[in-house]
Amino acid sequence: SRSLPSSPVDVASSLARLGAGLSKQAATVPGLAREIYKVSQKAKKDENYVSIFQAPDTVLNQTVTGSRRFAAQSYSLSRLKVIAKAFGCTVNTVVLSMCGHALREYMISQNALPDEPLIAMVPMSLRQDDSAGGNQIGMILANLGTHICDPANRLRVVHDSVQEAKERFSQMSPEEILNFTALTMAPTGLNLLTGLAPKWRAFNVVISNVPGPKE
């Protein structure tokens, strides 16, 4: 267990760190309020814009059980790069769009495709080339375009969604990003555990390109 400060100097130092931390967190409130307002307003004007708690109800979002299934699929990276270059996006965005297509086809096969697009929670590195310290990760919400039949149009919607999330985070401090993520994701986590607020769904699936263990 963590030991308590043993001297007045240690106590003063701990209180100073606590005060600095609280001040830094409090300073994020205006920025968070501004971003939440912007998100809510833009969502009213753009049907493809990803707002908070707009993920639709799907057959995927049920009580978690012990049943598990693993499937793997390989694709040529060179082909993905050609597509990414043609559409002016990243390979990761192409993969997100492919996942959107796969989910759309699966939902259609189950007669369960919602009218609204599925939303993915995507871990994203926020590190700058000159930044110090450990990992800096943010969680963005991406529109997977599952309501769109045309693959090219779907890719454009996914790309726009990812870019908007990146631009939003680029204008925020690390503390604001952390608190914004917590504010938008925490209610969803609570709902997953309790099922008390089924409408508080920020995302339907998690899609990540974080490498797994090499062995």
Stretches with model-predicted labels:
Residues 1-215:
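Soluble acyl-CoA-dependent acyltransferase catalytic core bearing the H(X)4D motif
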